[in-house]
From Swiss-Prot:
PANTHER family: 60S RIBOSOMAL PROTEIN L38 (PTHR10965), LARGE RIBOSOMAL SUBUNIT PROTEIN EL38 (PTHR10965:SF0)
Any GO MF annotation of the entry: structural constituent of ribosome
Keyword Ribonucleoprotein: yes
Source organism per UniProt: Maconellicoccus hirsutus (Pink hibiscus mealybug)
Coiled coil residues, start to end: none
Protein name (Swiss-Prot/TrEMBL): Large ribosomal subunit protein eL38
Keywords associated with the record: Ribonucleoprotein, Ribosomal protein
Keyword Ribosomal protein included in the entry's annotation: yes
């Protein structure tokens, strides 16, 4: 089940939990989404500042599996 987190500190606490398995980082042109998979919930944090996103990426726990996903350009047909 998905849950959205608004605070960076709260996200880091969730990422350091024992049941946190992996983090997916989705980069879009307007924002960066961090998704941490825990046993019960998938916690999502949306950051619009690219510098804060890089700092958060560096402060993730080292034992956690991190996967980066870049956005695709959507094809708009007239």
């Amino acid at each position: 089940m998905p849950r959205e987190i608004k605070e960076i500190k709260e996200f880091l606490i969730k990422a350091r939990r024992k049941d946190a398995k992996s983090v997916k980082i989705k980069k879009n042109p307007t924002n960066v989404k961090f998704k941490v998979r825990c046993s019960r919930f998938l916690y999502t944090l949306v950051i619009t500042d690219k510098e804060k996103a890089e700092k958060l990426k560096q402060s993730l726990p080292p034992g956690l599996q991190v996967k980066e996903i870049k956005c695709r350009k959507s094809k708009t047909t007239p």
